[in-house]
């Protein structure tokens, strides 16, 4: 099945919008994510989990898996380095411990070695297998027949062309991905 184009929205007045496509699926014990990105430059300065990956070429999945208002931010740079946070609001988020981040299987078309910004058009992909145990503040046993609130993002805060894209529109003036009130709905079969 061909990739469906991600609904894109630049939430800051910026003419630059990289091309981003993604797929999401689930198994009996994991969420599967695959992002394809084409952008004018690419950077992967962070190679250790729970670092500032959003400043690199980064894709993100935010979700409320248990319907209780507590959301997880799973952020991944273009070499598969991740950050996982949890909490009800932007402030005071708790980072996942190493034993949790280590559960996420990752693959990147650019390998896993950090590098400074490469100013050239680059296509890259990243795939993640996120076991339900990554939602470490909850006991998620299955997503079968469930609806969850979520959003998908592409950013590059410190690239030569900073950008902030979201799948579900964020209807505020300044970019803020930590707005679960603007999450869309995912329906799992």
Where do the PLM segments sit?
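Acidic/polar low-complexity flexible segments
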Residues: 50-59, 63-75, 138-189
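Surface-exposed molecular-recognition determinants
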Residues: 111-114, 135, 148
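Beta-strand-rich interaction surfaces with strong enrichment in secreted/lumenal proteins
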Residues: 12, 20-23, 106-118, 174
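An exposed acidic His-Trp-rich patch
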Residues: 73-119
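Generic short beta-strand segments
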Residues: 8, 36-41, 131-133
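Surface-exposed, glycine/proline- and aromatic-rich loop segments on solvent-exposed faces
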Residues: 14-90
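Localized edge beta-strand/strand-to-loop motifs within extracellular or lumenal beta-rich domains
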Residues: 118-139
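Single conserved hydrophobic/aromatic residue that forms the stacking wall/gate
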Residues: 1-11
């Amino acid at each position: 099945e061909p990739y469906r184009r991600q609904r894109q929205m630049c939430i800051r007045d910026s003419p630059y919008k990289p091309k981003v496509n993604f797929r999401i699926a689930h198994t009996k014990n994991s969420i599967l994510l695959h992002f394809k990105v084409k952008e004018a430059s690419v950077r992967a300065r962070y190679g250790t989990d729970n670092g500032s990956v959003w400043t690199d070429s980064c894709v993100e999945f935010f979700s409320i898996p248990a319907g209780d208002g507590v959301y997880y931010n799973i952020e991944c740079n273009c070499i598969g380095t991740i950050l996982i946070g949890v909490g009800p609001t932007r402030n005071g988020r708790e980072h996942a411990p190493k034993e949790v981040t280590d559960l996420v299987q990752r693959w990147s078309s650019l390998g896993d070695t950090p590098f400074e910004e490469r100013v050239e058009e680059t296509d890259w992909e990243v795939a993640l297998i996120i076991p339900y145990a990554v939602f470490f503040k909850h006991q998620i046993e299955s997503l079968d027949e469930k609806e969850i609130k979520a959003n998908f993002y592409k950013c590059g805060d410190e690239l030569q062309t900073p950008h902030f894209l979201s799948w579900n529109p964020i209807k505020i003036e300044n970019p803020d991905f930590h707005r679960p009130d603007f999450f869309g709905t995912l329906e799992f079969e």
